[in-house]
Curated annotation (Swiss-Prot):
The gene is queD. The active site is at C39, H83, E151. It comes from Aquifex aeolicus (strain VF5). SUPFAM superfamilies: Tetrahydrobiopterin biosynthesis enzymes-like (SSF55620). GO terms for molecular function: 6-carboxytetrahydropterin synthase activity; metal ion binding. It catalyses: 7,8-dihydroneopterin 3'-triphosphate + H2O = 6-carboxy-5,6,7,8-tetrahydropterin + triphosphate + acetaldehyde + 2 H(+). This is 6-carboxy-5,6,7,8-tetrahydropterin synthase.
């Protein structure tokens, strides 16, 4: 891409990485003591999402795309996910948390069909924005270059298609 622009969003959300087990899998060989699987607990983050779109050409306004339009392409999703609890519908806790949310209105549930790790959420936002560009007839002119999702100040995940 000759030109790229990035737009940053912030939102608060909870999640649970129900598949986390630090005793095996990639990287387990670096663990010397018995690890604590903290991310299986219900917890939250102040997420920072950065989306980058690009093009080999500029519009008649000399832009890849106006930042205003990038913001509006994601605005509805960001509003929906903000202050929600992101949970995999396959998580064993999902039925009970859904019942609690419905019974008491105490929790805004955002169900997904994947374990909501930072990596999986980055791909989720990438796919969502790509679909929005396609629906608008812009996908040939503008491409989603990458999505970066910061879960904490020191931990991020990045997704891009090759």
């Amino acid at each position: 891409m000759k030109w790229e622009i990035s737009k940053t969003f912030r939102f608060e959300a909870g999640h649970r990485v129900w598949k986390q087990n630090l005793t095996y899998g990639r990287g387990a060989q670096f663990t010397k003591e018995k690890p604590v699987n903290k991310c299986v607990n219900l917890h939250g983050h102040s997420y920072v999402l950065e989306v980058t779109v690009g093009s080999d050409t500029l519009s008649e306004q000399d832009m890849v795309m106006d930042f205003y339009h990038v913001k509006n392409a994601l605005k509805g999703l960001i509003e929906e996910i903000d202050h929600s609890f992101i949970i995999d519908v396959n998580d064993p806790m999902y039925p009970e948390l859904k019942d609690v949310a419905e019974k008491y209105g105490a929790m805004k549930i955002f169900p997904v069909e994947f374990c909501p790790t930072a990596e999986a959420l980055a791909k989720f936002f990438y796919d969502f924005l790509k679909k929005r560009l396609e629906e608008a007839g812009l996908l040939g002119e503008v491409k989603v270059v990458k999505v970066v999702l910061w879960e904490t100040a020191t931990s991020k995940a990045e997704y891009k298609e090759e």
